[in-house]
């Protein structure tokens, strides 16, 4: 039986691999897949490349993962249809670069570079090689690392004004300020200063913020306004300032107790203590994550083990919208989306739900990303693309996703659109082990960050910060 054919129209947004107009339309076999199409494009009659370039192909904004015939059948199209194939260079895997060892589990990472939020907020540029990685650990300490893996600064211990228990979240607030929070229910503000040679630095505690009655598991910062958001196991969302003069007096009852007394006895310095600008009773269970709306710093989103995502008006300390999912939520990230913002929510059910936060949205969940085999603990947007993100899970992996790499969900998955990871990043600390940890035991990943200049930075139970170079993974050129 003769093999079917279909007319295709090749397009690209990359001028250096643009076909001449007379070659853009072609009749190709319907049994061809991505690899075959890539061979056709590289051929002498088409692009005539000196060495083969691997290509991926999109039809209506989604990657082609089947034969053209299977695509036509799945979409109810006939072979008389002309298919528009947008071609791009194939995705680049994130390569391992380095690991930075700690004394205890690493709960949090942040990056300071010319392209990071702090770098963009700041007035001075960051020279190549002067990027910094901030880590927070269960040993109660913060560390600032250079890209060579040297810890150029370590925070003070509890006896000198540091955290009295494990750190759960730490962020660069500016080039000279860091905020951290953790199991001791406090947020601490640190002055950060580097020596002229940039080989050493100091972290000096300058402010302690009290208000929560449970551990603080997540903070978000907005440098231009010096504002901080916190999510606590007490179910509340806190709103704070890093300016001592603008912060309210602290509730004295919140700083009493054995740990506070012990610190006052042993420390030789006294750090000012202040309270929150507001505390919002948002959730009926532990609040696990909070973020600023990247487009409007007066709006925030919070998540909880009570299955809800709340949209918050920070100015009025009010809840303006509630979205309820089927499972407890552990992590949040705002994605630019395609035309409008999307919220990615990592759940205890091992998947990531993509939520349209607009009140006018017809459905709560726009897409589901499946692949993790344990809790999804952290999510970060691809800095190079509107379509990409990376997630960290308790299964011991980070997974890179492209929202154009999708399929139709099965009945067991609740139907709908399902995304699958395009790359899986394992922990390098397990590479020499012969047995795979069950459920990520010993290598759970707690946090992940994706920076244009530094790469994908992750932290976990293996006491390591791991760096994988990830720029261009999801191809922003499309």
UniProtKB/Swiss-Prot annotation:
Region (Ubiquitin-like (UBL) domain) spans which residues? 6-89
InterPro entries per record? G-protein_beta_WD-40_rep, NLE, WD40/YVTN_repeat-like_dom_sf, WD40_repeat_CS, WD40_repeat_dom_sf, WD40_rpt, WDR12/Ytm1
Q: Which UniProt keywords apply?
A: Nucleus, Repeat, Ribosome biogenesis, rRNA processing, WD repeat
| Membrane-traversing stretches | none
Repeats (WD): which ranges?
115-155, 162-200, 211-250, 282-322, 371-411, 440-478
Q: Among the entry's GO cellular component annotations, what is one?
A: preribosome, large subunit precursor
Judging by the UniProt lineage, the source's domain of life is Eukaryota
Q: What's a single GO MF annotation on this record?
A: ribonucleoprotein complex binding
Instruction: Extract the Pfam families matched here.
Output: NLE, WD40
Q: Which SMART domains match?
A: WD40
| Biological process (GO), any one | maturation of 5.8S rRNA from tricistronic rRNA transcript (SSU-rRNA, 5.8S rRNA, LSU-rRNA)
Location within or outside the cell: Nucleus, Nucleolus; Nucleus, Nucleoplasm
* Task performed by this protein: Component of the NOP7 complex, which is required for maturation of the 25S and 5.8S ribosomal RNAs and formation of the 60S ribosome.
Complex and partners = Component of the NOP7 complex, composed of erb1, nop7 and ytm1. The complex is held together by erb1, which interacts with nop7 via its N-terminal domain and with ytm1 via a high-affinity interaction between the seven-bladed beta-propeller domains of the 2 proteins. The NOP7 complex associates with the 66S pre-ribosome. Interacts (via UBL domain) with mdn1 (via VWFA/MIDAS domain).
Give the family, as the similarity comment puts it. Belongs to the WD repeat WDR12/YTM1 family.
> Know the name of this protein?
Ribosome biogenesis protein ytm1
What is the taxonomic lineage of the source species?
Answer: Eukaryota, Fungi, Dikarya, Ascomycota, Pezizomycotina
Encoding gene, per UniProt annotation:
ytm1
């Amino acid at each position: 039986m003769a093999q079917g054919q279909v007319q295709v129209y090749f397009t690209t947004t990359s001028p250096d691999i643009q076909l001449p107009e007379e070659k853009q339309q072609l009749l190709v076999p319907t049994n061809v897949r991505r690899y075959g199409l890539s061979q056709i494009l590289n051929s002498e009659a088409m692009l005539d490349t000196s060495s083969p370039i691997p290509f991926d192909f999109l039809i209506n904004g989604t990657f082609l993962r089947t034969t053209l015939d299977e695509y036509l059948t799945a979409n109810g199209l006939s072979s008389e249809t002309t298919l528009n194939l947008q071609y791009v260079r194939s995705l680049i895997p994130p390569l391992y670069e380095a690991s930075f060892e700690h004394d205890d589990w690493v709960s949090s990472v942040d990056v300071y570079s010319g392209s990071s939020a702090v770098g963009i907020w700041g007035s001075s540029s960051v020279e190549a090689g002067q990027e910094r990685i901030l880590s927070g650990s269960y040993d109660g300490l913060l560390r600032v690392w250079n890209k060579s893996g040297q810890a150029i600064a370590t925070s003070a211990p509890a006896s000198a004004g540091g955290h009295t228990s494990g750190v759960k979240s730490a962020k660069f607030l500016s080039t000279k300020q860091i905020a951290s929070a953790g199991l001791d229910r406090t947020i601490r503000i640190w002055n950060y200063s580097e020596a002229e040679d940039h080989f050493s630095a100091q972290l000096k505690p300058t402010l302690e913020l009290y208000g929560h009655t449970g551990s603080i598991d997540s903070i978000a910062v907005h440098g231009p306004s010096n504002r901080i958001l916190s999510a606590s196991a007490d179910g509340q969302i806190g709103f704070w300032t890093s300016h001592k003069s603008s912060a309210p007096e602290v509730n004295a009852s919140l700083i009493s107790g054995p740990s506070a007394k012990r610190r006052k006895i042993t420390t030789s310095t006294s750090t000012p203590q202040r309270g929150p600008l507001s505390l919002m009773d948002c959730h009926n269970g532990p609040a696990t994550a909070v973020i600023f709306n990247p487009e409007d710093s007066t709006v925030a989103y919070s998540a909880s083990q009570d299955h809800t995502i709340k949209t918050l008006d920070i100015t009025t300390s009010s809840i303006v919208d509630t979205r309820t999912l089927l499972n407890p939520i552990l992590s949040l990230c705002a994605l630019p989306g395609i035309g409008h913002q999307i919220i990615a929510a990592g759940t205890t059910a091992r998947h990531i739900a993509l939520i349209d936060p607009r009140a006018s949205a017809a459905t709560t969940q726009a897409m589901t990303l499946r692949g993790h085999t344990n809790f999804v603990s952290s999510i970060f947007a691809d800095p190079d693309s509107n379509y990409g993100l990376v997630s960290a899970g308790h299964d011991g992996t980070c997974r890179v996703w492209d929202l154009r790499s999708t399929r139709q969900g099965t009945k067991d998955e609740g139907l709908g659109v399902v995304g699958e990871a395009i790359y899986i990043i394992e922990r390098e600390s397990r590479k020499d082990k012969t047995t795979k940890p069950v459920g990520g035991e010993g290598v759970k990943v707690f946090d992940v960050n994706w920076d244009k200049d530094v790469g994908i930075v992750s932290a976990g139970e293996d006491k390591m910060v791991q760096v994988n170079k990830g720029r261009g993974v999801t191809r922003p050129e499309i």
